[in-house]
Amino acid sequence: MAALPDRDKLLRNFTRCANWEEKYLYIIELGQRLPVLSEEAHNPENIIQGCQSQVWIVMRQNDDGVIELQGDSDAAIVKGLVAVVFILYHQMSAQDIVAFDIRPWFEQMALTQHLTPSRSQGLEAMIRAIRSKAANIS
């Protein structure tokens, strides 16, 4: 399984896509790169409310204080959006996640303008859930 790119490479790769069909395919590919989430983690405690598709996100803090995120979705494009969010929050502490404004990255990628309203709402629900969990850890 190929590793996920860092933030800058994500943005570069995204801007290299010729059109939105290519960008959607790239997002789906990123979702396919996510490590498999265990069956035990597919439980109501980890489900994200407010997403039309089913989304599970598991968050834990490692010994260095860095937040580790794992996730899954039953929809390919949404799983890719989970991967995008994880890339943007990669190697951050709980405090960093709470303080980090992720939306300018979405604007640079022109992502929110090209998502359906329900996917945009789901993306916001993911961000709120991650930030809320991070605030409880910090």
Curated annotation (Swiss-Prot):
CC per GO annotation: cytoplasm
Single GO biological process annotation from the record: sulfur compound metabolic process
Catalytic-site annotation from UniProt: 51
Superkingdom of this protein's organism: Bacteria
Primary localization: cytoplasm
Compartments, as annotated in UniProt: Cytoplasm
This protein's UniProt keywords: Cytoplasm
Gene3D superfamilies according to UniProt: 3.90.1010.10
Membrane-spanning ranges: none
Name of a matching Pfam family: SufE
Pathway field: Cofactor biosynthesis; iron-sulfur cluster biosynthesis
Family statement drawn from the similarity comment of this UniProt entry: Belongs to the SufE family.
Protein's job: Participates in cysteine desulfuration mediated by SufS. Cysteine desulfuration mobilizes sulfur from L-cysteine to yield L-alanine and constitutes an essential step in sulfur metabolism for biosynthesis of a variety of sulfur-containing biomolecules. Functions as a sulfur acceptor for SufS, by mediating the direct transfer of the sulfur atom from the S-sulfanylcysteine of SufS, an intermediate product of cysteine desulfuration process.
Summary of subunit composition and partner proteins: Homodimer. Interacts with SufS.
Protein name: Cysteine desulfuration protein SufE
Lineage, opening ranks: Bacteria, Pseudomonadati, Pseudomonadota, Gammaproteobacteria, Enterobacterales
Gene: sufE
